[in-house]
Amino acid sequence: MSENYSFSLRKFKLVFLGEQSVGKTSLITRFMYDQFDNTYQATIGIDFLSKTMYLEDRTVRLQLWDTAGQERFRSLIPSYIRDSSVAIIVYDITNHNSFVNTEKWIEDVRAERGDDVIIVLVGNKTDLADKRQVTQEEGEKKAKELKIMHMETSAKAGHNVKLLFRKIAQMLPGMENVETQSTQMIDVSIQPNENESSCNC
């Protein structure tokens, strides 16, 4: 039993990128602890957390690297992108400039990793829909053009956060067979929970 567990437990590095105050840390905190802190504190440099995810017949360990959005820390980021499995590019749907700037973050990822990385574009803060500056269609269009995954979330309300990480886990290298075998079961178990969310965004 322990042998099978050791074999199936693979580690994957997920790097969170994006401008300052788009909610990178809040997404990680919601996923890790199911909590949201209203007090904003800028990430200084790089933070690291790890969480084990239990899927249908596979267990994976996700290493979550939270990067600072400030310009003065930009020189640190390429070294963290270099050996990542997933790059999660976050923007704030109430800040159009943060959406525009996702292009340079994606360019940085491509420069370091080429096509050997999963890139996910995430529009955060859907709980502030009345202040929205970026439509969901704009996000989906950009993701389609770049052939990457797109999802909107609210770290504050918890909307789509678990689903985001579940979908990322399904896309990880070596997970193709698991996804093929259990797609229907996953859809049935996840979607109703998300639809029942109290968030109207």
From Swiss-Prot:
InterPro entries: P-loop_NTPase (IPR027417), Rab (IPR050227), Small_GTP-bd (IPR005225), Small_GTPase (IPR001806). GO terms for molecular function: GTP binding; GTPase activity; protein kinase regulator activity. Belongs to the small GTPase superfamily. Rab family. This is GTP-binding protein ryh1. GTP binds at residues 18-25, 66-70, 124-127. It is found in: Endosome membrane; Golgi apparatus membrane; Nucleus; Cytoplasm, Cytosol. The keyword 4Fe-4S does not apply. It holds the Pfam family Ras. The keyword Isomerase does not apply. Changing residue 25 to N: Growth inhibited in ypt3-i5 mutant cells; no effect on wild-type cells. Keywords: Cytoplasm, Endosome, Golgi apparatus, GTP-binding, Lipoprotein, Membrane, Methylation, Nucleotide-binding, Nucleus, Prenylation, Protein transport, Transport. A motif (Effector region) lies at residues 40-48. It is a lipid-anchor. Has a role in retrograde traffricking of proteins from the endosome to the Golgi. Involved in protein transport to the plasma membrane. Involved in the secretory pathway where it has a role in acid phosphatase secretion. Required also in normal glycosylation trafficking pathways.
